[in-house]
Amino acid sequence: MTTRYGIDAPYGAFGFIFVAFLYGAGTLWGIIPPFWGWLTGAWFLLLGLWMLLYSMTIKLSHRHRILALSGLKPNMKVLDVGTGRGLLAIAAAQKGADVSAIDKWSGWDLGGNGREAFDKNRLAEGAPGIDLYDGLAQDMPFPDETFDLVISHFVVHNISGRKERERALAEMVRVLRPGGTLAVSDIKNMSQYRKFLEENGFQTRTYSFYHTFPFSKLIIAVRTPVGTGCSIC
């Protein structure tokens, strides 16, 4: 059995490749000037192939970098918010963590998303049991101060509206134990996330990555003892 973690934003990846095909066809038929036609077509093809490469190979190694920077240790209680096919949750469980995961299972955000795909990947990787929940990041069914580490990868930007995104962050904060760590990996709105967390008493550190598609950042946030947040660059 092989792991299949799906294609991130599949309509975007194949959309880029389709646009590249249209530019190539338009150039061959003389509709588009050759220089601009081939150049633009090649650019869209590169974007589409990069998205596919990230989804199929790069993110498999990138997940370990996220977990390492998050300070994951065996026996930690970990929550993966927006787990999808289990990319981070399964890797965390393999490293000895007690993992729970939650998702609303959107096929638009991740191809083939669902519980069945999650379970197939967990079995393929030989990971121990993971508690799986259905639900939204803005309204999670967990008691306050439950987890040592809360992680979220390429999820929060998919939530529409600033207030709703902050509701999701507030929920992650709510279920985090005192002294716990919140790790948010995303492709945009990072200054909003950082500002919200620092205003709520977290010390943050931000990491940038240029091998992901799109380029991404990771915020590692820990509540400061005095409850006043700040940023460490």
Located regions from the model:
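A short glycine-rich, Lys/Arg-flanked "PGG" loop and its adjoining helix->strand segment in the class I
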Residues: R165-P178
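Core SAM-dependent methyltransferase catalytic element
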Residues: N200-G201, R205-C233
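A short acidic, Gly/Pro-enriched loop at the edge of an enzyme's catalytic core
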Residues: G135-V150
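N-terminal auxiliary segments of SAM/dcSAM-dependent transferases
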Residues: M1-G41, L52
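Conserved beta-strand signature within the Rossmann-like core of class I S-adenosyl-L-methionine
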Residues: G179-D186
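Conserved SAM-binding loop of SAM-dependent methyltransferases across substrates and taxa
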Residues: R85-G96
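S-adenosyl-L-methionine
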Residues: G111-L136
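Conserved class I S-adenosyl-L-methionine
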Residues: P74-G84, S100
